[in-house]
Amino acid sequence: NYSIELSRKNWASYTSYTKSYFGDIHMGKVRNHGYEDWGLVNYYSQNINGEFFENQSVNNNPNLQRNTAYKQKDLIQKFNFKVSKTARLILNFQFSESSNINRFDKLSEKNEEGKLKFAEWYYGPQKRSFISSKLSFQSKKLFDRADIIFAYQKIDESRNKRKFGSNLLNIQDENLNVFSVNSDFFKRIDRQKSIAYGLELTNNQLNSDGFESLVNSENLNK
């Protein structure tokens, strides 16, 4: 993680960048309940990173949940401006992106023959972009304090799956755009009474496309 903070009399800035790597999950070896084979992962799929394996592979460490590793990076940028004696503006920018994220539960499913059902089942890189502006100001008439937020968020992700014995990858692409306006107002009447009220408007635009892609099986691994 890398972060930088800068500030002056009327403004401040915060920048943060985080890069994370999460490895495959390890299970404990002690099974006090008496079921020694419970949860063991004896077979797994090596069909990742463009590789094509026709059959399931033997897991030389059954306590290791293979294909659960993934990477992620996050970027945050915030600005805080003092617009006047009674007003402040905050700008917020965020971006995050992951690698492919495998569905371990789906990759562990078995068919009627007791073999692994899916060669691939993963979420494609999840991308999230977010931008917002928040204006906070004071007044002595209709309210004591007000916060107005304009925000936009974009999320892209996909679901990808392919069964063993097939070279067709089923892909479901999803794109979501979210627009929102949020306003909050606060007014104190006396020491014991106060009023809080607000308004929120949102608009969600979702686009979903499904299609199939032919997986290159020229370099077939048995």
Question: Across the structure, where does each feature detected by a protein language model lie?
Answer:
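Residues that scaffold the ATP/ADP-binding catalytic core of kinase and kinase-like folds
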Residues: 101, 122
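Transmembrane beta-barrel wall of Gram-negative outer-membrane proteins
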Residues: 2-22, 27-100, 127-129
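Surface-exposed beta-strand edges and their flanking turn/coil or helix-capping segments
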Residues: 2, 18-19, 27-30, 103-106, ...
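Face-selective signature of the C-terminal outer-membrane beta-barrel domain
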Residues: 82-96, 124-222
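Short hydrophobic/aromatic-rich motifs at helix boundaries and adjacent loops
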Residues: 45-51, 103-105, 152-157, 205-207
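Flexible, surface-exposed loop regions and adjacent strand-edge segments
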Residues: 30-38, 45, 105-116, 162-171, ...
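Extracytoplasmic loops and strand-loop junctions of Gram-negative outer membrane beta-barrel proteins
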Residues: 1, 57-63, 73, 113-120, ...
